[in-house]
């Protein structure tokens, strides 16, 4: 019983020390606060200004939170992951390949497709910025240009016209004048449409196998046997015989360059 008052006494002492520390920091001398590093800008040789390293680090860490959305919405990731998911459903193997393998394959194929764009971003934006030749604002503009060109090549004109009309933009003078708020949803819509078109083409041969197997089982009176169990080996054999992985992944990569 004697330990209980000691516990409350220690808790009250710690609480008092915390309050005292907070009050001390509040009334700290202004000279102490002045010694802390501030957020300033640095002049560049060409007359521009650049932020201090602390602000650059803060901007970088903040931009990392948007990296998944940028990877999903502004690259080839969306088309590839949808086609591979539809292929898995068409084969009738919902757990093979596993999600981790599917995501890893999609990421590596995305980096392969986007490597020319990433090389341009590195050469035209990051390298001059790291050598203090350009400011961060100019680096962002130069880095966004290759991504814009990639997105414009993959976007249908009908989708651009739709979102231009919804944004109430009167007239766009050339592709370089398309604003990002119009280009992003138009690009995603085009990618979804293209992915489902490729998925439909992938589904057709496996659907034919399912129909043939189901018809044979009904003709033999084996209606209690699930057709998916019988058709799975035939679908796997067909996919292996035509070298399906090479055909599909090669076609996916080529679809971004045609």
Swiss-Prot record:
It is a multi-pass membrane protein. The keyword Transmembrane applies. The keyword Ion transport does not apply. Its main location: membrane. It holds the Pfam family FliP. GO terms for biological process: bacterial-type flagellum organization; protein secretion. The chain crosses the membrane at residues 20-40, 64-87, 98-118, 194-213, 220-242. It is found in: Cell membrane; Bacterial flagellum basal body. Keywords: Bacterial flagellum, Bacterial flagellum biogenesis, Bacterial flagellum protein export, Cell membrane, Membrane, Protein transport, Transmembrane, Transmembrane helix, Transport. NCBIfam families: fliP, PRK12797.1. Belongs to the FliP/MopC/SpaP family. This is Flagellar biosynthetic protein FliP. The gene is fliP.
């Amino acid at each position: 019983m004697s330990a209980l008052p000691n516990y409350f006494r220690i808790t009250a002492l710690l609480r008092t020390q915390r309050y005292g520390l907070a009050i001390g920091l509040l009334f700290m001398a202004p000279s102490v606060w002045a010694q802390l590093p501030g957020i300033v800008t640095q002049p560049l040789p060409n007359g521009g200004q650049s932020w201090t390293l602390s602000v650059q680090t803060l901007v970088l860490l903040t931009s990392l939170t948007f990296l998944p959305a940028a990877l999903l919405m502004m690259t080839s990731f969306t088309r590839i992951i949808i086609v591979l998911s539809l292929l898995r459903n068409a084969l009738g193997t919902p757990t093979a390949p596993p999600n981790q393998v599917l995501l890893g394959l999609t990421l590596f194929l995305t980096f392969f497709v986007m490597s020319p764009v990433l090389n341009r971003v590195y050469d035209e934006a990051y390298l001059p910025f790291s050598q203090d030749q350009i400011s961060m604002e100019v680096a962002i503009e130069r880095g966004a240009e290759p991504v814009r060109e990639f997105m414009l090549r993959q976007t249908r004109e009908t989708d651009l016209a739709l979102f231009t009309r919804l944004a109430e933009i009167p007239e766009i003078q050339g592709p370089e004048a398309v604003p990002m708020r119009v280009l992003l949803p138009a690009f995603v819509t085009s990618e979804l449409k293209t992915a489902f078109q490729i998925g439909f083409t992938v589904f057709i041969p496996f659907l034919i196998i399912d129909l043939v197997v189901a018809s044979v089982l009904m003709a033999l009176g084996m209606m209690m046997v699930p057709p998916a169990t019988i058709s799975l080996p035939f679908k796997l054999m067909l996919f292996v015989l035509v070298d399906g992985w090479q055909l599909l992944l090669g076609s996916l990569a080529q679809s971004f360059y045609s």
